[in-house]
Every structure is written in C-alpha cells, then in structure tokens.
C-alpha cells in the first residue's frame, strides 16, 4: 500500500538527488520505492478498468436482453 511516508520519502529523495545527490543506498531505495509505487498504481488502474469493463459488459447484456 502506498503510504504518506512512502510519498514523502520519494519526494525527499527526489529533491536530495537534485540538490546534493544520492548515495548508492539512497539510489537503490529510490528505485525500490518508485517500483513499488508504479506497481501499485498499475494494479489500481487495472482493477478500476476491470470493474468498468465488467459493469459495461453487464449493462450491455442487460440492455440487449430487454430488446427481445
């Protein structure tokens, strides 16, 4: 789950990378945090789209059924 702390940390590392640079450990942490963040966003979008298409499919069949 994406927490406020995760986002704060991503932002902190981003700004630090721009101002003074990151250590190798921080670069690795930043990479892992970003991967986790992107993975969760993708899963969230996929779930929403699956729900959307499931609803659309349900409504389509439902409407189609009434035509007969």
From Swiss-Prot:
It is found in: Cytoplasm. SUPFAM superfamilies: YnzC-like (SSF158221). The keyword Cytoplasm applies. The keyword Cytoplasm applies. InterPro entries: DUF896. Keywords: Cytoplasm. Pfam families: DUF896. Its main location: cytoplasm. GO terms for cellular component: cytoplasm. Belongs to the UPF0291 family. This is UPF0291 protein TTE2340.
């Amino acid at each position: 789950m994406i927490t406020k702390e995760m986002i704060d940390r991503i932002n902190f590392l981003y700004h630090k990378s721009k101002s003074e640079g990151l250590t190798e450990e921080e670069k690795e942490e930043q990479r892992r945090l970003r991967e986790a963040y992107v993975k969760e966003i993708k899963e969230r979008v996929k779930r929403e789209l699956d729900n959307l298409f499931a609803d659309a499919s349900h409504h389509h069949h439902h409407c189609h059924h009434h035509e007969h």
